Amino acid sequence: MADTKYVIGLDYGSDSVRALVVEVATGKTVATSVKYYPRWKKGLYCTPLENKWRQHPLDYIEVLEASVKEALSLCPEGTAENVIGMSFDTTGSTPAFVDETGTPLAMKPEFAENPNAMFVLWKDHTAVKEAAEINEACHKEGAVDYTAYEGGIYSSEWWWAKILHVLREDEAVRDAAYSVVEHCDWMPALITGCKSAKDIVRARCSAGHKMMWHEKWGGLPPQEVLSSLDPLLDGYRDRLFTDTETADKAVGTLPQE
């Protein structure tokens, strides 16, 4: 029916994306599609013996296009014209360094084959040392415990540890990076045409649990706290974000295509 409305959900897992088309009024599943990340499937950009797991942003884009097209092809005629929303969930923390436009560095020719310019997958454990330093800083006597709302222990799987590890390891990425984006925030920014890193809407769930964001201390930890971990983090707080939004808030509008 022409007045039937639909939404599309995309679940980005470790190996693949699942697209789901749902009828808004009834919650009925109309069609699904699963597509595997092509580069990841080949084992590219990862070093298992080092617990180094990276994913290319092109993998995310290509499976987005393929899964949505296939799912819609399985729906009744006219469904695509009546899609009124899309939503994403992803594994985390899976951050990537971006330029001022919010583009992951791996999308640039000079970084296309550099794993440090790609998304650092949730299960990447290369930042064990950095996580230990964060825990030590947060738990020393008299310090504000910025891990208090994250279970009291900061993990090497999380945002700040991974960011600091890459900054220390890769001068080229360090020099080219303007900001950092979480996978769950980049996908909505991508499909809504966001062209500025500062305009990317940040999800409260990932920010609160992985990035030590909390209203109690005004958002992210203060710059002086970050810089005390390593001067390489100087300036990052202002280039990241202050506010976050909950999952019930729209971040933009769908383009016609």
Predicted regions and their residues:
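Short, well-ordered alpha-helical packing segments
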Residues: I61, E65-L72, V120, A131-N135, ...
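Gly/Ser/Thr-rich active-site cleft segment
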Residues: Y12-S14, E136, K140-E257
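Active-site phosphate-binding/coordination module
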Residues: L44, E77-W160
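Short loop segments at secondary-structure junctions
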Residues: A25, E100-T101, H125, E169-E171
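N-terminal glycine/serine-rich phosphate-binding loop of ATP-dependent small-molecule kinases
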Residues: M1-K108, D234-D243
